[in-house]
Amino acid sequence: MYVIAHHRFTNPPTAFERGIRLIRNEGAPAGTTGLQFYPSSDASQAICLWESDSVADVQAYVDDTLGDASVNSCWEVDGEQAFADRPLGLQPSAAVRG
């Protein structure tokens, strides 16, 4: 399934520092992979798209990783209603995962 994680950063510098683990999928539960990362231009929040076996796995992973630097809400994507095209001008994940 696909899962959205909406992050509202309470401490953006700390959240971005800790979030490197999320971007690299370090310590992610089995079957859980980050696919897309969309931070706001003011660094106050971000939306991420995950592929996972469960919403609970993503919720626990982002909560444990970001800690008190972010308030996170996760939900399953409704695949019947959702759509996607690759946004032009965004770098591929391999460019930021190192």
Question: What role is predicted for each listed range?
Answer:
Residues 1-45, 53-57, 61, 77-98:
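Short S/T/G/P-rich N-terminal loop/turn motif that feeds into the first structured element of a domain
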Residues 27-28, 65-73:
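A common structural junction motif
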